[in-house]
Amino acid sequence: MTFLQFINNNRQEGQGYISEKLFKTKKNEMIRKTVTNLVAVRLKNLSHEFDVIENYLRYIASTSEHLFTAIKRHFNKCARKLLKEAIDSKSNSETATVVLQEGFSGICLLKASSIILKLKLKFPKKKDRTDISKLCDKKERMTQWLEISILMN
């Protein structure tokens, strides 16, 4: 049974899948290479937003453009070229971001063959009311301290 046959047999309408793959690696002395074979695939229903057979997200909550700073110390020519390809709307590549924590994200360029480029992105963090109130408190304490120091001198 192939992977797609397994999915078609176990598919429920409106369900997505997450898979875990088990690989077996052995060293072939004749070819002098390490050979990796897929041994088993385990699937789990996750959400209705991802269709495995079509390989796309059916629904994305919001798509918005954010200003970001790419953090990568050593860009070579290949990395710059791949990043330009990802930005270009005419290319067949896709870009995907994975949020690691608030304000930071990871971005990768996805092609049919592999994931090519990984970057860390720093998004400007929105200020909460608590952050603004803490800033106001610090400002008030600073002005009080300055007034006291001026009066003493």
From Swiss-Prot:
Name listed for the protein in its UniProt record: Putative pelota-like protein YCL001W-A
Organism: Saccharomyces cerevisiae (strain ATCC 204508 / S288c)
Family: Belongs to the eukaryotic release factor 1 family. Pelota subfamily. Highly divergent.
Taxonomy, superkingdom: Eukaryota
